[in-house]
């Protein structure tokens, strides 16, 4: 889920930045420190939206930098359990498919792709339903539910998000439309 959070921190402004626009300098320092980082409690920081408040700076003996207490807004993405997501399939491998969820990728294990036995076609990089003939491949758009989350502090790479498409109205968007049309025809 995307959120705007208000965060308080202390920013170290080096002496070479004195005399420049303080708000712009603080925002630049915050962007370098936070943007693109993953925090288990906050989520994945996408952008520093605004610097709301900058307190009076204090100079520490022997340092020369000014330390300013600041309050700022940031745009974050934090995956939540049971959240419904839509995303693009960015990779298909023998054990499942990876779906882009904004700044992170989630894995749909082969057992969670569809209610059918499936096989992996390495030439097409696709997962194919044996009875239904349904195909899931790179570039397809899907709707899925988050069923497990393991975020590693500071590391996007070690984080894992597990997804399922084995619930009503989840799956490849084409499959969902076909299911809706079939139900309407039955009525």
UniProtKB/Swiss-Prot annotation:
InterPro entries: NA-bd_OB-fold, RNA_pol_Rpb7-like_N_sf, RNAP_E/RPC8, RNApol_Rpo7, Rpb7-like, Rpb7-like_N, S1_domain. It comes from the Archaea. GO terms for biological process: DNA-templated transcription initiation. It is found in: Cytoplasm. NCBIfam families: PRK08563.1 (NF006333), rpoE (TIGR00448). Part of the RNA polymerase complex. Forms a stalk with Rpo4 that extends from the main structure. This is DNA-directed RNA polymerase subunit Rpo7. One of its GO terms (cellular component) is DNA-directed RNA polymerase complex. Forms 2 domains with an elongated structure; Rpo4 packs into the hinge region between the 2 domains. The gene is rpo7. Its EC number is 2.7.7.6. Belongs to the eukaryotic RPB7/RPC8 RNA polymerase subunit family. HAMAP family: RNApol_arch_Rpo7. Keywords: Cytoplasm, DNA-directed RNA polymerase, Nucleotidyltransferase, Transcription, Transferase. GO terms for molecular function: DNA binding; DNA-directed RNA polymerase activity. Residues 82-166 form the S1 motif domain. Pfam families: S1, SHS2_Rpb7-N. It catalyses: RNA(n) + a ribonucleoside 5'-triphosphate = RNA(n+1) + diphosphate.
């Amino acid at each position: 889920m995307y959120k705007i959070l208000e965060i308080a921190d202390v920013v170290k402004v080096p002496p070479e930045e004195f005399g420049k626009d303080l708000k712009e300098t603080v925002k630049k320092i915050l962007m370098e420190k936070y943007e693109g980082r993953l925090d288990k409690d906050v989520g994945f920081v996408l952008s520093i939206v605004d610097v709301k408040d900058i307190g009076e700076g204090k100079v520490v003996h022997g340092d020369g930098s000014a330390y300013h207490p600041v309050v700022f807004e940031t745009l974050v993405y934090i995956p939540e359990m049971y959240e419904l997501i839509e995303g693009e399939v960015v990779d298909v491998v023998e054990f499942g498919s990876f779906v882009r969820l904004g700044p992170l990728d989630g894995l749909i294990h082969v057992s969670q792709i569809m209610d059918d036995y499936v096989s992996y076609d390495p030439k097409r990089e696709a997962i194919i339903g044996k009875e239904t003939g349904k195909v899931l491949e790179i570039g397809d758009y899907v709707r899925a539910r988050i069923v497990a989350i393991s975020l590693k502090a500071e590391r996007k790479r070690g984080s894992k998000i597990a997804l399922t498409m084995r619930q009503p109205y989840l799956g490849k968007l084409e499959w969902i439309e076909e299911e809706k049309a079939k139900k309407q025809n039955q009525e």
